[in-house]
């Protein structure tokens, strides 16, 4: 396995561990999620380039579109929560509260 694939898998693993460790704040969770999406995008781009299959080039673009939508929704949720509560703790996101 080439060293670049191992580096990308390591970046994904570190982002996943960061997501599991720093899950009390929404901003740190969003940053870790973006790191995971970036490593998945790079991995899918490298796989599409190595496969030489024309339809495989659509997968990284679709992943990038979903990552942009996820970032926009996450940032709007972060702004809404910080305007309402004054901080970005995830325990404020309970659906049982009114």
Curated annotation (Swiss-Prot):
Q: Which InterPro entries match?
A: NADH_UbQ_OxRdtase_chain4L/K (IPR001133), NUOK/Mnh_C1-like (IPR039428)
User: Which regions span the lipid bilayer?
Assistant: 1-21, 29-49, 58-78
Q: What is its EC number?
A: 7.1.1.2
Q: Any keyword Translocase?
A: yes
Q: How does it sit in the membrane?
A: Multi-pass membrane protein
Q: Where is the signal peptide?
A: none
| PANTHER family xrefs | NADH-UBIQUINONE OXIDOREDUCTASE CHAIN 4L, NADH-UBIQUINONE OXIDOREDUCTASE SUBUNIT ND4L
- What name appears for this protein in its UniProt entry? NADH-ubiquinone oxidoreductase chain 4L
Q: What is the source species?
A: Presbytis melalophos (Mitred leaf monkey)
Report which gene this protein is encoded by. Answer: MT-ND4L
């Amino acid at each position: 396995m080439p060293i670049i694939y191992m580096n990308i898998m390591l970046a994904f693993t570190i982002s996943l561990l960061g997501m599991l460790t720093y899950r009390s704040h929404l901003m740190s969770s969003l940053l870790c999620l973006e790191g995971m999406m970036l490593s998945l995008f790079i991995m899918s781009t490298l796989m599409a380039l190595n496969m030489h299959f024309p339809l495989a080039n659509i997968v990284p673009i679709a992943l990038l579109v979903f990552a942009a939508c996820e970032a926009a929704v996450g940032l709007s949720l972060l702004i809404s929560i910080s305007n309402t509560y004054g901080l970005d703790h995830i325990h404020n996101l309970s659906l049982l509260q009114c």
